[in-house]
Amino acid sequence: VYKRQRMPGKNVVILGSGDIGLIMARRMVLEGAKVQCVAELRPQSGGLKRNIVQCLDDFNIPLYLNTTVAQIHGRDRVEGVTLTKVDDNGKPIPGSEWEVPCDTLLLSCGLIPENELTRGLGADMDGKTGGPIVGENLECSIPGVFACGNVLHRP
């Protein structure tokens, strides 16, 4: 959105209230979108309190806790989503669904690294971080295979 100066849509629902989701809510508003809401599966936001205030409260964006996306509507593009409340186990609560019109669903849920490929290749893995062991140049124990980003650590 920022670099390419191109908006994916004008009416946004965000799933995930960690700091990245909160900051994206603010960025989308500043770029001219209407953020309908932020939905969070857990009973509390994963973001910093100041980000909740500066990114949601300051822009009157509702935060729905214990809530997830049950359905995405639309054929060629998103036309809306069905949100639903969830119980303590993260399971949808029947009868708690409601529809939110939107043309964009921004997913900001979990930065858990995907290490299946490096593990499957037989790379040496770090028991503490869950990611591959790398050298100074970020090369794994397999020559020519490099790692970066979230695979190097886990939240």
Where is each model-derived feature located?
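Residues forming the flavin
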Residues: K3-P155
